[in-house]
């Protein structure tokens, strides 16, 4: 049996599994954990330890058909201005519970499209955030940027407020692919955006690509990657397109007949990995690449790579505070998601309530399983002695799961004398499926994306 046939027989093209950007995955969250938990977790923060802050801006001028994010379209700035006002109100609510002296080691603006904000709104929001949670000395402020919705005044405003990393969504530069996903973005506009960012001192650059898009093939993806390499990013993420029209209604606009088949998707992923590694990048986890001197590559080599809701990260802050509709916070005590619908979120804030509406309170077992899965996702191994050192006898519950994974996914898993498990390079496409063996929660597969 060929390697690809063996991968296929193990369910590579059929399984739907979590991306494990959190553990447990978000579908496990419960309405039993809400605003009271949110307030208590914020009040328990240690001012001596910097936190990460995520700001969600759920607006776009145009809705890309492939996107499954919580976003809404608007052709005017009025709802955006109103929403920023609500963000400022939420910050004031958070401030009531926040211990004095808490600082932000990381600040990330995502969406939607944060660059839909005008320069005036950029300044207003950034200054309000810093008034409540000032930057730590060695901070990172990153912003997701749409090259078609940004100009020099916006970049200048972001730079003046401290942005030092930009993340540019690209997906694919091929005209027919862009037309099929409702996203027009010429390479020239993207290159001009990058040049302007660098002119304003933003030298750390991430780019996002997607494989498995309609009409995409090896030639078109290779041409896109060639152009991306010309931009000189420090990091690249390339995600598999998840076609879930039953969850993301706008995906019904995509013609399923021109989507690459499973084998073609697999070949596209392998092509991207080959081109980026040959282009001087180190492979990070299952879908990221970074220059050897980038902090993410350094973290990966030193065993400090972590997972969060943006994917892989070198962020060492133990707390993520989410601000805005649908944003998710991660506290030592567990996870908390803000009300997802923008109107309901605004209503909660206007009533003077913290907007947390569902979450999960972590147990000792959750911490153990979560760390085991994070090891697998970040390092392609499970270090059993390290789990024993941290969790004591409870780590022994991983032994039968290691045995199960080794039997189910042979010959792609090896187990050493210490009981630690490693995934061979040829089997790393199965990583999410292997991680699921260590997931103690049973959730419907329909909630998740394809494993490959």
From Swiss-Prot:
Chain positions recorded as S-adenosyl-L-methionine 1 binding sites: 54, 111, 144, 328
An MF annotation (GO) of this entry: coproporphyrinogen dehydrogenase activity
Keyword annotations from UniProtKB, A to Z: 4Fe-4S, Cytoplasm, Iron, Iron-sulfur, Metal-binding, Oxidoreductase, Porphyrin biosynthesis, S-adenosyl-L-methionine
Catalyzed chemical reaction(s): coproporphyrinogen III + 2 S-adenosyl-L-methionine = protoporphyrinogen IX + 2 5'-deoxyadenosine + 2 L-methionine + 2 CO2
SMART domains, per database record: Elp3 (SM00729)
EC numbers: 1.3.98.3
A GO biological process held by the record: protoporphyrinogen IX biosynthetic process
Major localization class: cytoplasm
Keyword Metal-binding attached: yes
UniProt keyword Secreted present: no
GO CC term (a single one): cytoplasm
Binding site for S-adenosyl-L-methionine 2: 66, 112-113, 171, 183, 208, 242
Localization terms from the record: Cytoplasm
Pathway listed: Porphyrin-containing compound metabolism; protoporphyrin-IX biosynthesis; protoporphyrinogen-IX from coproporphyrinogen-III (AdoMet route): step 1/1
Cofactor(s) named in the record: [4Fe-4S] cluster
The protein's enzyme class: oxidoreductase
Domain of life the protein comes from: Bacteria
PANTHER family per record: COPROPORPHYRINIGEN III OXIDASE, OXYGEN-INDEPENDENT COPROPORPHYRINOGEN III OXIDASE
Function: Involved in the heme and chlorophyll biosynthesis. Catalyzes the anaerobic oxidative decarboxylation of propionate groups of rings A and B of coproporphyrinogen III to yield the vinyl groups in protoporphyrinogen IX.
Subunit relationships: Monomer.
Family per record: Belongs to the anaerobic coproporphyrinogen-III oxidase family.
Protein name (database record): Oxygen-independent coproporphyrinogen III oxidase
Organism for this UniProt entry: Cereibacter sphaeroides (strain ATCC 17025 / ATH 2.4.3) (Rhodobacter sphaeroides)
Chain's gene name: hemN
